[in-house]
């Protein structure tokens, strides 16, 4: 999850397994930058004297910065070039030039898997399906690349240009090559409809700058249509901006829930703590409440800001959680510009649900556990009537 200095998560983000490798009670030694500088000058002198080929100074510098962040042994702390950073900023505004697919990274294997293909997208037209593993982009094998780099440097690009992607399909043990023409992708991060029994259905694909307004509008429209209960679908939502998740919880909960002491008389939504025990506390303040029974759908790819949202409503018993255990990413990254157009993303804190639960590495266990039917997992479009997890949420609402 990301906050802002400018601050953002991922995407979904992207997701990995663990926090910086400093155990409690240990002091991290800082690198001796004077010694490092001296050694770099020595290496540069050798390059100048004997290196056979032309040196690309810009590329060398960028690898130095990337290496410094990689040395933290934290998959979420990375360096972004000015080009990378610009692409990330564009993606938070809800539009970009790309293929129209959502990709998740396995925290253990590092494999990048397609979890959703948007309707009408060039990815769907090319035959990409949920479950496809990204094997190669162009001539580049992407194994070991972070999700941020894979998306920003390889998949996104200039509108109208082609990208060659090779995917692996485990069910058929085959590799599929596809040529996808990048287009301007306008992705609504919130989709809504009214289901049977006046059940409002709101699917949130990620928490971006545009998501709060879309979410509030969707709920208002469903309430005007006579909504009596609601399903909020966060399956395969990789997270995003902490402020957006907080604002959306705020829209649902009243301001005066005093269940948890740390809220100091206000409705506590989430709080963070850095390595010194300092952090931020987020409470409800908008005066709005959604007063209908709620079910939240999650799965193993629901991460970060999705878990902030789910954890808060679960702690207040405002929602029943349905699906499979969520991803378990309970740490905060800050996205910090460096003044020359580049930026770093760095892990700064743990976050905790209102009850004090640290879900990092654990995830949120659903109240009603149900796997998606196997035959639905590779389908790009599944109707609520076909979706056994949506139907399980409908049943859970009847029982609650």
Language-model features and meaning:
Residues 115, 124, 138, 149-329, ...:
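Cleft-lining beta-strand/loop regions that shape enzyme active-site pockets
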Residues 180-186, 350-351, 366-367:
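A short, sequence-level motif marking secondary-structure junctions
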Residues 367-400:
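Conserved helicase C-terminal RecA-like lobe
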């Amino acid at each position: 999850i990301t906050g802002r200095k400018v601050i953002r998560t991922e995407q979904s983000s992207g997701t990995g397994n663990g926090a910086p490798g400093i155990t409690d009670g240990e002091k991290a030694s800082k690198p001796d930058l004077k010694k490092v500088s001296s050694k770099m000058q020595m290496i540069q002198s050798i390059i100048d004297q004997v290196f056979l080929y032309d040196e690309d100074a810009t590329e060398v510098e960028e690898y130095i910065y990337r290496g410094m962040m990689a040395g933290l042994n934290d998959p979420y702390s990375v360096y972004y070039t000015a080009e990378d950073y610009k692409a990330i900023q564009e993606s938070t505004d809800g539009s970009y030039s790309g293929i129209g697919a959502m990709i998740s990274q396995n925290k253990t294997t590092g494999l990048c898997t397609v979890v959703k293909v948007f309707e009408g997208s060039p990815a769907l037209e090319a035959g990409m399906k949920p479950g496809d593993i990204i094997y190669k982009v162009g001539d580049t094998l992407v194994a070991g690349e972070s999700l941020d780099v894979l998306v920003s440097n390889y998949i996104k690009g200039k509108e109208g240009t082609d990208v060659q992607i090779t995917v692996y399909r485990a069910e058929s043990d085959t590799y599929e090559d596809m040529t996808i023409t990048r287009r301007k992708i306008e992705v609504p991060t919130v989709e809504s409809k009214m289901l049977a029994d006046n059940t409002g259905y709101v699917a949130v694909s990620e928490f971006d700058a545009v998501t709060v307004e879309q979410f509030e509008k969707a709920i208002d429209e469903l309430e005007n249509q006579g909504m009596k209960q609601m399903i909020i679908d966060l399956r395969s939502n990789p997270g995003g901006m902490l402020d957006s998740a907080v604002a959306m919880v705020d829209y649902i909960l009243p301001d005066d829930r005093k269940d948890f002491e740390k809220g100091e008389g206000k409705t506590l939504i989430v709080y963070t703590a850095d390595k010194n025990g300092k952090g931020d506390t987020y409470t409800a303040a908008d005066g709005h409440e959604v007063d209908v029974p709620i079910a939240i759908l999650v799965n193993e790819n629901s991460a970060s800001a999705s878990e902030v949202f789910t954890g808060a409503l679960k702690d207040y018993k405002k929602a029943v959680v349905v699906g499979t255990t969520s991803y378990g990413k309970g740490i905060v990254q800050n996205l910090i510009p460096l003044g020359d157009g580049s930026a770093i993303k760095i892990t700064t804190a743990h976050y905790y649900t209102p009850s004090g639960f640290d879900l990092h590495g654990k995830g949120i266990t659903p109240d009603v556990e149900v796997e998606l039917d196997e035959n639905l997992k590779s389908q790009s479009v599944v109707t609520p009537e076909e979706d056994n997890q949506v139907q399980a949420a409908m049943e859970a609402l009847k029982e609650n």
